Amino acid sequence: RRMESEGGGFNLAAMQKDLLINVVPFLNGGNVHRLIAKILSRDPDGTPDFEYISELLEQAEPGSHGLFFLPYVTGERFPIMDSSVRGSFLGLSQETTAADLAQSVLEGVAFSIRQGLELFDQPAKKITLIGGGARERRWCRILSNVMGQKIFVYKDPDLLPALAIASAVFVAEGVIPDYQAFISTLESRGHCDTVEPDPEISARYHGIYQRYKGIYPLVREFYSEKY
């Protein structure tokens, strides 16, 4: 069905007749994960240290001890459309730890995704993560708790975008009848893990998320001024 949303969301005509693909161009996701892995890297050359981020996330607490991160490091197109805005930490204190920094950054991305999905006229029925960032299962856990929904992660999630694009060719060439055939094959043959939300943590995140939504309106004017 046609998507009517705010932000930079739009519709693409799919290869399959009378089917629309709802596209929401989140600009900040895996790049933010890579950025914090670079900033906190133990490597003198600053090579992104994803292993260290995983270790920090194991130590972290939901809510990052009051630290918030607005993840728009390259501007954003969805859930807000603003090319001037940039990433921001709010709530830094003398007690802030590296684990808080790592946790808050990935929480910020999760909050942004939740805010974007809430712009749709219907709630998401199923959330499947793709891309390299899905390899960080602690981040998947954060997203599941922020969304309050089960998250599905298939084997080799970084390859799924290429397979999905290939499925369009399969439909066009008649190799498969429709996209549902591709999805059914993936569900039956592709190894899939699920991440379940923790009800107590999800309830806590709901309140934190309400505060997060107030950050962008506060900083928008600051970033809109040119110097």
What does each model-found stretch correspond to?
Residues 1-130, 135-227:
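Active-site core segments that coordinate phosphate-bearing ligands/cofactors
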